[in-house]
């Protein structure tokens, strides 16, 4: 991993980024008690949950929006945790997955769902055909990119 001497402005991977967790911004929301230690879940409104991955440097946030007949999961995080099992604990509604775009931190859990709605762009189509190899995602899990949320 590349680090700079100025950890405040290092946008690649700041040293010990996880020391600043939990983020103060989450304190104004109700934290939902749930058994998955990879994700934190916050109720933003009566019908919207934020599913937050604080164990990865990118601190990915997916959203579960509850409707009358279906729920929409906006992005499936980076694929480290079991996001499907988690959303099934939060709702009994059928789940429709919508990806905002096709970067790994937004589609990592797509394989857990049957139907996915994603933008129809040349990049998205190329990624769907190519897929991801272990070699292409290995650095996503290297060094300080991931920390152990069990140490909270």
Identify what each model region corresponds to.
Residues 1-31:
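Accessory terminal helices/loops
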Residues 2-3, 45-54, 115-117, 124:
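Short N-terminal signal/transit or membrane-insertion segments
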Residues 6, 80-152:
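Active-site HxH/HxHxD metal-binding segment of metal-dependent hydrolases
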Residues 8, 31-34, 38-41, 55, ...:
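Homeobox/homeodomain signature
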Residues 21-24, 43-49, 152:
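Short Pro/Gly-enriched beta-strand edge/turn motifs at strand-loop
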Residues 30-37, 47, 145-152:
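Alpha-helix-centered segments that form part of catalytic cores
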Residues 35-89:
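Conserved beta-strand hairpin/beta-sheet module of binuclear metal-dependent hydrolase folds
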């Amino acid at each position: 991993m590349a680090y700079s001497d100025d950890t405040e402005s290092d946008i690649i991977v700041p040293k010990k980024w996880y020391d600043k967790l939990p983020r103060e911004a989450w304190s104004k929301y109700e934290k939902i008690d749930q058994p998955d230690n990879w994700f934190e879940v916050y109720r933003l409104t009566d019908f919207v949950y934020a599913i937050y991955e604080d164990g990865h440097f990118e601190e990915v946030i997916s959203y579960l929006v509850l409707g009358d007949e279906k729920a929409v999961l906006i992005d499936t995080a980076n694929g480290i945790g079991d996001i499907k099992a988690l959303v099934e604990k939060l709702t009994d509604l059928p789940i429709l997955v919508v990806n905002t775009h096709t970067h790994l931190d937004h589609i990592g859990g797509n394989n857990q769902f049957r139907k996915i709605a994603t933008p129809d762009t040349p990049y998205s189509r190329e990624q769907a055909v190519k897929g991801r190899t272990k070699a292409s995602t290995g650095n996503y899990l290297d060094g300080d990119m991931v920390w152990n949320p069990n140490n909270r």
